[in-house]
Amino acid sequence: MALPRCHRLRQRDRFPALYRGGRKLSTPSLLLRWLPQAEIESVNESRFAIVISLKVHKRAVRRNRLRRRLQAALLRLRDRLRPGFDGLLTVKPGLDLDTSTSQFLQELEDLLTRAEIIHGRQ
């Protein structure tokens, strides 16, 4: 299941700001860049985009499957997300594509907890 629209980062002008001035944290397979949302925006929900380059896998089918699994992991954590953040999740090359969704969930939860975007562990 895909992320709800309110949790998707779709504004193209926000991406350069995340690359330039976003704070960064990483794990062996994921990189998170995040920024607080601008005060101009009245969006309360935290929004995320997932980037998977050709370096991860050349086949779009595999990249899309990976994207869906990351979205599923984000969906499980959505109730614990603090509002007001824009995040960009980048999958690093060399990731084992057969990693289970529960491992993604654990790694993503660790990353978001360190970034203080979610409320503590469950």
Swiss-Prot record:
HAMAP family: RNase_P. This is Ribonuclease P protein component. RNaseP catalyzes the removal of the 5'-leader sequence from pre-tRNA to produce the mature 5'-terminus. It can also cleave other RNA substrates such as 4.5S RNA. The protein component plays an auxiliary but essential role in vivo by binding to the 5'-leader sequence and broadening the substrate specificity of the ribozyme. Consists of a catalytic RNA component (M1 or rnpB) and a protein subunit. Belongs to the RnpA family. It is an enzyme of class 3 (hydrolase). GO terms for molecular function: 3'-tRNA processing endoribonuclease activity; ribonuclease P activity; tRNA binding. PANTHER family: RIBONUCLEASE P PROTEIN COMPONENT. It catalyses: Endonucleolytic cleavage of RNA, removing 5'-extranucleotides from tRNA precursor. One of its GO terms (cellular component) is ribonuclease P complex. It comes from Synechococcus elongatus (strain ATCC 33912 / PCC 7942 / FACHB-805). Keywords: Endonuclease, Hydrolase, Nuclease, RNA-binding, tRNA processing. Its EC number is 3.1.26.5. GO terms for biological process: tRNA 5'-leader removal.
